[in-house]
Amino acid sequence: SIILLLFFSPCLRAGEWQWSVTLDGFVSNETNRNPTAFLWIPADCMQIKAIIVGQHNMSEETLFDNPLFREKMQKLGIGFVWITPGIDQQWDVSKGTQRIFEKMMADLADVSGYSELKNVPIVPIGHSAMATYPWNFAAWNAERTLAVISLHGDAPRTNLTGYGRENLEWGRTRNINGIPGLMIEGEYEWWEARVNPALAFRMMYPESCISFLCDAGRGHFDVADETAAYIALFLEKAVSLRLTDEVTKDGKVRLNPINPAKGWLAERW
C-alpha cells in the first residue's frame, strides 16, 4: 500500500547520530530539563579534523541530515554536534556558556573514544534566531574556530540580531581576523539593513574575512542541496588552507590565518 511504501522509504529516515550526552549546568526553559548534545562522526573516520556545532533552532538539523552534506563532510573528516534545545543565542560567556560547551566536548570525547574532540577545531553554525551566536563564539574562541557559518542569518556585531535583542559587546581587542566567515541570506528574505552591518564590519576590521551568499531562489526556511554543496565547498577550502600539523601549548591545532588581501574579491551584482 501507499502507507507501507512511505513507511519504508529510506528518504524519510532521519540521519544517524551515534552518541549523545546530557549537558550539565544548564536547564532549558523550554523543557525544564538539561539539553542533549548529539554527535555524528563520519563512517570509517579514524581521526576527526573539525566539528560543526549547531544549536536547535530550525534549519540546523535539516542541514546536518542532508545526505549530500554528510557525504561531503565524510570526505573531509568533519563531524557534527547538534544541541537540543539550544543553550544560548548570544554565546554569553558570563552566563557560563563557554564552560558548558567545553564540558560537553570533553564528555563527547569520553563517550565516543575520539579524544581529539576536547581540542578539535570548531565551525559554529546557526540559523535565524541562532545566527548571531556563531560570530560571538568565534570572537571568544578565535584560536579554535576554523570557519563561521551564519545560515539565513546575521552579520558579525549586528544591531539586528535574529533573536531580537541586544548583541554582545566584543571590546577593543577581540576580533575574528583571519577566520573565514560566511553570511547567507535567501533571495526572498533579503533585507539590505541586515547586510549593512557586515559591510561596516569589514571596513572596521580590514583583516576580517567575511563572505556573502545570496541564496538565489530560496527563502528563510530553505535548505537546498545547492546551498548545502556551497557550504561544503566553503568548508573544504577552509580545511585545505587553515589546518596544520602543528599543535599549540594547550593542545589545539594551530590554524593558519586567511589573508583577505590575497586571492580574489568579487563585486556585488
Q: Which residues are covered by each model-predicted region?
A:
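Active-site-proximal beta-strand/loop segments in catalytic clefts of secreted hydrolases
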Residues: 42, 54-58, 83-86, 125-129, ...
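A domain-start/cap signature at the N-terminus of enzymes
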Residues: 12-51, 96, 122-145, 149, ...
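Loop/turn elements at helix/coil->beta-strand transitions in domains of secreted/extracellular proteins
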Residues: 46-51, 76-81, 118-121, 142-147, ...
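Alpha/beta-hydrolase-fold serine-hydrolase catalytic core, especially in secreted/extracellular enzymes
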Residues: 208, 216-269
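Short substrate-entry loop that stabilizes the transition state in hydrolases
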Residues: 44-92, 157-158, 191-193
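The feature captures the conserved acid-bearing segment of alpha/beta-hydrolase catalytic domains
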Residues: 146-232
